[in-house]
Amino acid sequence: MKALAEAQHYLLIQYDNLIHTISEGLEYVEKQICDGGSFRTPVVFQGILDAFIQMNHTHEQIADIFNEEGMHLLLEEFSRMIIHLQAWFDEDTEEGKILLLRTRIIPSYEAWKLDVQRYLYPYVCH
C-alpha cells in the first residue's frame, strides 16, 4: 500500500462515500418505480447522474493515485455507465425504466463498485 498525502486520502474517503450514496439512490429509485412512482424519483435520478458526473471529474486524480492498468480500465468502464444512465431519459414508460435499471444500470454499477472498492478499502477502512 502506498503512502498518500492527506488530500489524496480525503479524496478516496469522499469517493467511497459517494459510491455508497449512489447505490442507495439507485435502490431508492428502483423501489419507487416498482411501487408506483413518486414525484421525487426523477429528481433523485438526476442527483445520481450529477453524482456520476462529479465522480468522473475526480478520475484523473484517482488514476494518478492508483497508477495501475486495472484501475484505468475501471475508470473507462465508469464512463460507459454514464451512457446507460442517460438512456433513462429516453425511456418513455415506467416498465422501460425498470428494465433499464434492473438489467443494465444497477448490475453494471454494483459490479463496478465491488471492483473499485478492492482498490479503495486498504485506504479508507481503518
What would you call each of these model-derived segments?
Residues 81-126:
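Amphipathic alpha-helical binding modules
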Residues 42-47, 72, 76, 97-106:
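Short, charged, amphipathic alpha-helical segments
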Residues 30-37, 63, 86-90, 120:
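A structural signal for long alpha-helical coiled-coils and helix-turn connectors
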Residues 1-46:
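Short terminal alpha-helical segments
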Residues 18-25, 51-58, 77-84, 108:
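Amphipathic, well-ordered alpha-helical segments in soluble domains
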Residues 63-88:
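Mid-chain, well-packed structural core segment of small domains
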Residues 51-72, 119:
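Short, solvent-exposed, charged loop/turn and helix-capping segments
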